[in-house]
């Protein structure tokens, strides 16, 4: 999503959330 590019500083948090959502 575009907001991910806007907040690269929270990339780790987003990645963690996405991982939880996918599993």
Curated annotation (Swiss-Prot):
It comes from the Eukaryota. Residues 1, 9-23 form a propeptide. Coiled coil: none annotated. Processed by the macrocyclase-peptidase enzyme POPB to yield a toxic cyclic heptapeptide. POPB first removes 10 residues from the N-terminus. Conformational trapping of the remaining peptide forces the enzyme to release this intermediate rather than proceed to macrocyclization. The enzyme rebinds the remaining peptide in a different conformation and catalyzes macrocyclization of the N-terminal 7 residues. GO terms for molecular function: toxin activity. There is a cross-link at residues 3-7 (2'-cysteinyl-6'-hydroxytryptophan sulfoxide (Trp-Cys)). There is a cross-link at residues 2-8 (Cyclopeptide (Ala-Pro)). Keywords: Thioether bond, Toxin. InterPro entries: Amanitin/phalloidin. Major toxin that belongs to the bicyclic heptapeptides called phallotoxins. Although structurally related to amatoxins, phallotoxins have a different mode of action, which is the stabilization of F-actin. Phallotoxins are poisonous when administered parenterally, but not orally because of poor absorption. Belongs to the MSDIN fungal toxin family. This is Phallacidin proprotein.
């Amino acid at each position: 999503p575009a907001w991910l590019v806007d907040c690269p500083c929270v990339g780790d948090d987003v990645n963690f959330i996405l991982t939880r959502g996918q599993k």
